[in-house]
Amino acid sequence: FCGSLVDRIVPGRIRDPKEVAELEQKHGYADPLLDVGEVFGVWVIEGDTKLNDILPFRKAGLEDHVFVTPDMSPYKKRKVRILNGAHTGFVLGAYLAGFDIVRDCMHDETILGYMNKMLLQEVVPILPLDQDDCKKFAAAVEDRFNNPFVNHELMSISLNSTSKWRARNMPSFLEYIEKNGKLPTCLTMSFAAYIAFYSNNIQELNDKGLVCKRAKGNEYTISDDRYVLEFYNAHKDDDIPTLVHAVMTNEQMWGQDLTKVAGFEEATVKNLTLIREQGAMAAYKSCL
């Protein structure tokens, strides 16, 4: 058995009836699990180079898409910190600001600028990987997110954002502080956006998840571990400082007490206040 890593954005079954009808007409058959993926695709297989003979992908002309390596951890770190970290870093605030799909976010100067600053100034420089390779990978993220054929919904990406921020963003956040001795502006804001998304005008907690309401007027349902949803529902009436402190000291969520990170609690109270009072777009703009 070989460990492997796939890097390709496949947003899930198409739910737009019009788009489904057009594709079924084009291809001549009905598919209840119809999906669309991006052209970009990488498959990393961890194992001995002899696998190139057993699995002859290179002979099939796929040497730019399938890689056999004795250690896939650099590829995993690059993908999780840059591609996945970008998603979790901006989508929650972007959704609160009224956006629904990733591509539209790439057409907004503020969100795009925020994402690029986060990646190029706060994430890439602290990765112990080839910097030129990471910069190229980060530069390609904008094009991948701007794919005109993939309607990647922000709510789909928001699934389990607590564990996602911990795995994708928190390592970069902590390593940046260790290296630079200060808080990373955009990654710090992304945590406040996470709290804002999970606590925005909570309506109810039901079997499907935690129901909140955004400024655009629609309700949205957060899907996450039940203990996370119950936590935010229990703290729905907290003022901002109390809520931030409760979130940061919840070691079940983060594996540590985040209030011990110098200045982080104060910065998050300030950022969450800005999001609540002026909106997520103003908060992202303040980072630029």
Residue ranges and their predicted role:
Residues 1-288:
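Substrate/ligand-engaging "lid" and interaction regions
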